[in-house]
Amino acid sequence: GYMKGDYPVVYNFFRGIRPLVEKFNPQKVYFVLEGNPQFRTQLNEAYKANRVNNDRHFHEQKAQIISIVKECFPFVTVRHPNLECDDTIATMVKVHCEQGDDCTIISSDSDFYQLLNVFDNCAIYNPIRKKMIDKPDYDYVVWKALRGDATDNIGGIPGCGDKTADKLVRSPELLSEYFKKDPIRQQIFERNVNLIRLVDFSDKLSEMERHDGVADFEQLYDILDDMDFQSMIKEKTWNKYVNTFKELL
């Protein structure tokens, strides 16, 4: 993070978004929000149960970020009421990539790596590691279904570590033999594939909640001033900030 203070989450977000827009110079920015998904928890009640965050101040700041983006930035905010953010992003990527657009996902979530297996015109940038992600030379969903995903509370096949998964994912014959030795392995694998594979919901595009934001830099300045983000609204810094987002108008 960039700072500590009353609104560190808000500060980090708005301080971090400008260099990303400047770096990639997009024609359009989608700001995708989480819905109220159910189908994966119906498959596995433990799914993402380890991600509960009861920090009231964090959630208040998250709501502030969403409000500020909608009111002040020329971004397209998208949300489906019943879908995970990941699936909504995957759906938007599919739609645009199939239209011939180049898409860049800004995320540290490795679930998106599977999209690199599908779309040549999709790229992923990890803002934490500050690097582009290389396309896997194997089926990422198969590998992750074997290993599991601790971040989403998805247990892997017992005894299957990185080395075993690396061998199995590259050999259908070895994978078939591996499952024959213990049918429980295949049951865990198939469950995990259903939990990990991002779903194409392009048939639900009409159900997406979409907000086409309009830039309001005067209001944004006042908000940042009220939050005492003085380093962001100094004249030189502020002019650079505004000019970055003017490219999206």
Model-derived segments and spans:
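Domain-level signal for Mg2+-assisted phosphodiester chemistry and nucleotide/NA-binding surfaces
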Residues: 1-68
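Extended two-metal-dependent nuclease catalytic cores across DNA- and RNA-processing enzymes
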Residues: 50-232, 248
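Short, amphipathic C-terminal "tail helix"
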Residues: 238-249
